[in-house]
């Protein structure tokens, strides 16, 4: 793993720590972190295909805050109040993650389930395609491992096969064990990722 570590990132980490120390506690730093958290929350929902947002509206929400009034008619494909709820869930999950790290709690499968529950708090269904190729809505199980297969289709028509439901619990245990081994060996974050 040593070959994968980036010496450049280590120096950037030092620069960031120095700048953070200078700015911490200032209004500028607080606003920067708020905008960054909103951007992460909004982009997470877009990446997960929970909603679509126009780029201009995305920037407006990042800069001005999560206000339903900022969503024009036609700027999203879902009801505006629902989109704001989903974004708020993503932001709250991020805040919870920061608290988790600050408390130095060890990563566990129970925490991952807790995080999942928070991320999807206002999401009751997930859009899916059944074995016959039909678009369906299936109830979303919150805070637990998947119970049904989810193998997405690629643009070329092939299927990308994810871990089968019956193996998810053991694979997640294995992932947590790998993480703990990386922490113990002080593996750099960019390698662990």
Question: Model regions: which residues?
Answer:
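FIC/Doc superfamily catalytic core
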Residues: 1-193
């Amino acid at each position: 793993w040593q070959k994968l570590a980036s010496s450049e990132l280590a120096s950037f980490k030092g620069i960031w720590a120095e700048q953070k120390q200078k700015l911490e506690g200032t209004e500028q730093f607080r606003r920067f972190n708020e905008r960054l958290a909103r951007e992460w929350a909004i982009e997470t929902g877009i990446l997960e295909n929970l909603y679509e947002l126009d780029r201009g509206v995305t920037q407006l929400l990042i800069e001005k805050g999560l206000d339903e009034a900022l969503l024009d008619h036609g700027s999203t494909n879902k009801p505006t109040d629902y989109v704001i709820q989903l974004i708020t869930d993503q932001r709250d999950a991020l805040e919870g993650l920061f608290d988790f790290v600050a408390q130095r709690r060890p990563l566990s499968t129970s925490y991952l389930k807790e995080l999942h529950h928070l991320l999807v708090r206002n999401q009751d269904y997930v859009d899916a395609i059944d074995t016959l190729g039909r678009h369906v809505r299936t109830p979303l199980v919150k805070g637990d491992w998947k119970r049904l297969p989810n193998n997405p289709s690629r643009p070329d028509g092939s299927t990308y096969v994810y871990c089968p439901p019956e193996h998810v619990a053991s694979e997640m245990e294995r992932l947590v064990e790998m993480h703990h081994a990386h922490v113990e060996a002080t593996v750099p974050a960019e390698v662990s990722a």
